[in-house]
């Protein structure tokens, strides 16, 4: 069977500006995959950087994979689809990842999938409609409300109408804006103000009064459509869904730490799990996730951000792509990321069994420290993202270590202590303390 993995990118790519390191390397992971599944032929059609598929920066490629690189000038949907078709694949799989400032790569991958399906090539990728629903937070909100899923109450703010008098000088009174403020006043405090099209929690504001909400919306920072929602209180979780055409696996959830504003931050949060305590009504949650998967007709990998508040599960966001927890779930299941992608496509069988794992952040590390970290016997993998042109400290990047794969939570916490002792110069107290708090949350429930 010939399998094509495809990966796209909408941003300008310049080698050397962003440095992505994965340990084990993509090359070694491809080699291990081929050794385990010699019956498969692997092709990667990609625009750089090809996150998770290619060792960007060192230009080392596995001899067990054929790479087809797509230049920016040839990156139209039709051209990429043609390049995939030229490989004569038995199946094509979208390997979609996140981008800034807009988390929209699943939309392009869905358009490519539409072309491939028209050419009778089996393709694992979410539909265009699904990708658009997940990309736009307001459309997500509408979908959830219309289908009776628990989500926060909110008010949509259309930016052009909110400032309609700027382009229509005849307007003396902006009725739309007054209506927005009237609706916001009916929401329960505190509130979170979201960019409807932004990545994750970037650009969000948490406010504790209606006056603060009004101030944010009237400020220069408000330069696009916004969604103002009630800011629900409770622990934060993530869960993933794998499969297609009604055949889905819903994982156990992982619990997430939050920042000082109560938001999950990709660069700062700690993940720990699985969470199975009876208090959290996991069977009910999984049934709702299956209902979600079937309504969206998911195809491949998807991730859902959740909150457990007032003894109920609430959906915060849906990501129609590989997420920041996908590798951690692969570790929990005892398989590689590539095997998880194949499993989500229905190509290989895996018996889902979840061991305790943790995803912990470190500051940027040198090569020696990265390798030392990766060589710990309980470490599944280490990733580092470095922005070499960062202008602010918070933009320089981070390292993350995924470790554990243990039968008991205590064993993972023992592993954490080893890391704290071995890498005391680099272990930041906020992450260590957050990990301890998450463990207590799991143990106490």
What are these regions (language model features)?
Residues 4, 133-227, 233, 245, ...:
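Active-site nucleotide/adenylate-binding loops and adjacent lid/helix of ATP-dependent enzymes
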Residues 299-310:
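A short glycine-rich, hydrophobically flanked beta-strand micro-motif that places a catalytic Asp/Glu
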Residues 211, 230-296, 319-345:
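ATP-dependent carboxylate/phosphate-activation module, predominantly the ATP-grasp catalytic core
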Residues 206, 241-243, 306-308:
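Conserved hydrophobic "DFG−1" position in protein kinase catalytic cores
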Residues 340-445:
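Peripheral (often C-terminal) accessory segments that flank ATP-dependent C-N-forming ligase machineries
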Residues 1-123, 163-165, 422-432:
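ATP-binding N-terminal substructure of ATP-dependent carboxylate-amine bond-forming enzymes
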